[in-house]
Curated annotation (Swiss-Prot):
Organism annotation: Streptococcus agalactiae serotype III (strain NEM316)
Positions contributing to L-isoleucyl-5'-AMP binding: E554
GO CC list: cytosol
Cited InterPro entries: aa-tRNA-synth_I_CS, aa-tRNA-synth_Ia, Anticodon_Ile_BEm, Ile-tRNA-ligase, Ile-tRNA-ligase_type1, Ile-tRNA_ligase, M/V/L/I-tRNA-synth_anticd-bd, Rossmann-like_a/b/a_fold
Protein name, as recorded: Isoleucine--tRNA ligase
Gene: ileS
Length: 930
């Protein structure tokens, strides 16, 4: 027998190396086979419900790291709720209609206009479902637990039917109307866009300063006066029908020296504009307020048949331009609003493809709108005062990445203005995390226009609207309910397969169709109406769910997207928000804080992380960052995260190994019988349990990460486990000291594994498989630990906090002695503490082996007054460090005066000799092997 065999060296097959890329899929397969999701739901039957409603990602392509951040965050929340006394089902969803899928098919050579529409839509459907399958596998590979067999998909008949019912309810309340307002128009998509489909980029544009001649000055201005106008969209001059001034702004008429013309412009801009126009000297002739100029008539710069009326508008500023803006009601929201209010014609001179139309004039017809600036300048002639290139933020189609225009076209709208205040009131009642989200969404709703819900595309849910012979739009509840029933049975494809008459209720008549003829709408709904109806198609439709949801969690871009559209439809139909709380996350940037893009080559795919590190590292990274703001990721950052994971794993491995001979039912020691330091660690750990549980409830993942890492690295590795080895390895296997520590080890091991399960489910399950005394087959079926409190714990914590400070000071003294070559390892030390009465009282109160806690072989507590001149002091406490007296015990590795060679061939101290002689008589008789 060898001497080391008398030590209780922990034994475990739990591997030090995780091998996550290979093991994770094995655990996921085991979960699927055991149907863990359903088992967890069954365990929670009858408990309070918690419903996180999944915002549907778009079904196109593999997931990116932003998807991973979002889905992992949701999974952590749902898992923690499921283990904390809540019935928390999680139904994943997918958004499947819209232009991107049409674009994919177009790139594959599919020509929509050359094939049967039903066949084309079936191709769209098949592609979308293939992407759902692909992304489902991607999400499952992340370890996300969900009802994967019963997701919601926006193209399914039942969902489309529920979406139509939302539309029908809004129409029944008078919230749906048709109008020819200017909308965001994408010539590259040939469709209207919603605000959520817009992104902004900085571009260079040519701006023009030009003048309109006064035709009728209404006794205020002479006809030799010209009103100076500024525009950044020269093509819209073709449709200009008015000039807008600020009602309370001050204007002046100036006469440049040497010019026969006089010019009107904002007074505060005179000097800067004069310099721009090359007016070296000028005279101010008259002063006017904007109100005085109202209804003055001017000539269009080149179209002699058009008059442009001066009108008043509060949107005019002097931040740039001239203080006067030309007004084309067909090409801008502000222009439209003031134009309609003043009776201006709404003229549109650009077609759906961005080409100038016949009404723009023969010189412009057929040209692309963005290429006509030189021609506009030519047509302006000497009315053009200046031209310059400016850099400004401009809206782009988020899918095609092409610029868009405002363009008035007949569209269907949801009248947000009719119930705006109700929406704002609901926002006030909703909890937001971070808190600024409330103001952000509030301001968006307050300032937004009515919602353009029609799209001129094919792949989507048709607008369930019919037209009578006299043009009357029909969308009564009777009709929309019938269409919804048809969609539920056949899918929305039936809209394209049947004539209008066959889509209406049997025997339907309408006074506007005396001949019984009807037409059906060919536009589809905005895809944001699709996902924005999910509260009805999912939360309100499934028996195991409830509406409103407890939580919506998405990226901060969804304040103008899903958070927005869901809120509008829910308030419109039911008068309340679809959610009780909204949690938003920032974007994922690269390690330098730059936006990820394929062109920059700085993207990181979840699949790459899974292959190199494992999904657990990505999951741990999610908890390590403050996702309420933009977060950074890189392979270097993930490598650092994997190091933290390794520390956590190896600490838990140590606990597994050193409780391998511990049966909690037989060997556990009651709290009151634990050693002082063991009680301290029990109290300390329960504080961590409390912190983590509260952080889970607050969705504060970073607080969980910090609590776990600090406890594992500081409280366990750097303190408790550091000296505990000298007990659990060296003391007799069944000794009270060892069983006390094992009790604490096992308690921490089991509870910390449960606490980590929502974050590191694969690792937690692997650990659980080694805990043979636990009843649950899988840790996911266990319950979260509840923090305990103990009598007198505050006093105990205070005492140990003071000791930890003293221990830190002692470690500094030991380090100095090590540097001075007095000792090597701390176990070679004889440490003397020159203690005040206060420190002596503290050390006595701890009732502990202080030498053990300091990890020194010998310790002396001396009077503070006796400190020698060569002592070292830290924060008022003096220490001396000498080499310990005696020889090294071959078993405990401590230096001990009682160490001597024994008859059985080893040099050990009396304490080790007693253990050997009691428990290993055969070795005593035969001697130990070398």
């Amino acid at each position: 027998m060898k001497l080391k065999e008398t030590l209780n060296l922990g034994q475990t097959a739990f591997p030090m190396r995780a091998g996550l890329p290979n093991k994770e899929p094995q655990w996921q397969e085991a979960w699927d086979q055991a149907d863990i999701y359903k088992k967890r739901q069954a365990l929670n039957e009858g408990k309070p419900a918690f419903h996180l409603h999944d915002g549907p990602p778009y079904a196109n392509g593999n997931i990116h790291v932003g998807h991973a951040l979002n889905k992992i965050s949701k999974d952590i929340i749902v898992r923690s709720k499921s283990m904390s006394g809540f019935r928390a089902p999680y139904v994943p969803g997918w958004d499947t209609h819209g232009l991107p899928i049409e674009q994919v098919l177009a790139k594959k050579g599919v020509k929509r206009k050359e094939m049967d529409l039903a066949e084309y839509l079936e191709m769209c459907r098949d592609y979308a479902l293939s992407q759902v399958d692909k992304q489902r596998d991607d999400f499952k590979r992340l370890g996300v637990s969900a009802d994967w067999e019963n997701p919601y998909i926006t193209l399914t008949p039942d969902y489309e039917a529920d979406q139509v019912r939302v539309f029908g309810a809004m129409a029944d309340k008078g919230y749906i109307y048709r109008g020819a307002k200017p909308v965001y128009w994408s010539w590259s998509s040939e469709s209207a866009l919603a605000e959520a489909e817009i992104e902004y980029h900085d571009i260079d544009s040519t701006s023009l300063y030009y003048a309109n001649k006064v035709k009728d000055g209404k006794g205020i201005l002479d006809t030799d006066t010209y009103i100076v106008v500024w525009t950044t969209t020269p093509f819209t001059v073709t449709a200009s029908r008015g000039l807008t001034v600020g009602p309370d702004m001050e204007y002046v008429v100036v006469a440049p020296v040497g010019s026969e013309r006089k010019y009107l412009l904002a007074e505060v801009l005179v000097d800067s504009l004069a310099a721009k126009f090359g007016w070296e000297n000028f005279e101010i002739v008259t002063h006017h307020t904007g109100k005085e100029l109202n209804h003055i008539v001017t000539e269009h710069p080149w179209d002699t048949e058009v008059e442009e009326l001066v009108i008043l508008g509060d949107h005019v500023t002097t931040d740039s331009g001239t203080g006067i803006v030309h007004t084309a009601p067909g090409f801008g929201e502000d222009d439209y609003n003031v134009g309609i209010a003043n009776g201006l014609d709404v003229v549109v001179t650009v077609d759906s493809r961005g080409l100038m139309m016949e009404n723009a004039g023969p010189d412009f017809e057929g040209q692309f709108y963005d290429k006509v600036t030189p021609l506009v300048k030519e047509k302006l002639g000497d009315l053009l005062l200046a031209s310059e290139v400016i850099n400004h933020s401009y809206p782009f189609d988020w899918r095609t990445k092409k610029p868009i225009i405002w363009r008035a076209v007949p569209q269907w709208f949801a009248s947000v203005s009719k119930f705006r205040q109700e929406i704002l009131d609901e926002i006030e009642k909703t909890n937001f995390q971070p808190e600024w989200g409330k103001k952000r969404l509030y301001n968006m709703i307050r300032d937004r226009g009515d919602w353009v819900i029609s799209r001129q595309r094919a792949w989507g849910v048709p607008l369930p609207i019919f037209y009578a012979e006299d043009g009357t739009a029909i969308m009564t509840k009777e009709v929309t309910d019938h269409v919804a029933d048809l969609f539920a049975e056949y899918g929305s494809i039936v809209w394209w397969q049947r004539d209008a008459k066959d889509l209406l209720p049997a025997g339907y008549t309408h006074p506007g169709s005396p001949n019984g003829l009807f037409e059906k709408e060919t536009d589809i709904m905005d895809v944001w109406f699709d996902s924005g109806s999910s509260w009805n198609g999912v939360m309100n439709a499934r028996e195991n769910l409830s509406y409103p949801a407890d939580l919506y969690l998405e990226g901060s871009d969804q304040y103008r997207g899903w958070f927005n559209s869901s809120l509008i439809t829910s308030v419109a139909v039911n008068g309340h928000a679809p959610y009780k709380a909204v949690l938003s996350q920032g974007f994922v940037l690269d390690g330098k804080g730059e936006k990820m893009s394929k062109s920059l080559g700085n993207t990181i795919l979840p699949s790459d992380v899974e292959k190199q590190f494992g999904a657990e590292i990505l999951r741990l990274w999610v908890t390590s960052v403050d996702s309420s703001n933009d977060v950074r990721i890189s392979m270097d950052i993930l490598k650092q995260t994997s190091e933290i994971y390794r520390k956590i794993r190896n600490t838990l491995r140590f606990l597994i190994a050193n409780t391998s001979d511990f049966n909690p039912k037989q060997d556990a020691v009651a709290y009151e019988n634990l050693g002082a330091v063991d009680r301290y660690m029990t109290i300390k750990f329960n504080q961590v349990v409390d912190t983590i549980n509260k952080a889970y409830a607050a969705y504060d993942f970073m607080a969980i990460y910090k609590a776990v890492v600090n406890f594992v690295t500081v409280d366990l590795s750097a303190f408790y486990l550091d000296f505990a080895k000298d007990v659990v390895y060296i003391e007799a296997a069944n000794s009270p000291e060892r069983r006390r520590m094992q009790t604490v080890f096992y308690d921490i091991l089991v509870k910390l594994t449960k606490l980590l399960t929502p974050i590191l489910p694969h690792t937690a399950e692997e650990i659980w498989s080694y805990l043979e005394h636990e009843e649950e087959e899988f840790v996911q079926l266990a319950e979260m630990p509840v923090a305990q409190t103990f009598s007198g714990q505050e006093e105990i914590l205070e005492e140990w906090s003071a000791f930890m400070t003293l221990r830190t000071q002692a470690q500094k003294a030991l380090e100095e002695a090590r540097n001075a070559k007095v000792i090597g390892k701390s176990l070679e030390a004889h440490l003397t503490i020159y203690a005040s009465q206060e420190v002596k009282t503290l050390l006595t109160a701890l009732n502990s082996d202080i030498a053990l806690l300091m990890i020194v072989s010998q310790l002396t507590i001396a009077d503070e007054a006796d400190k020698p001149a060569d002592s070292v002091s830290f924060e008022g406490v003096a220490f001396t460090v000498e080499h310990a007296e005696g020889e090294v015990c071959e078993r405990s590795r401590r230096i001990d005066p009682t160490t001597r060679m024994r008859s059985y061939g080893v040099a050990v101290c009396d304490a080790s000799a007693a253990i050997i002689e009691q428990y290993y008589p055969e070795a005593v008789a035969q001697g130990f092997e070398a």
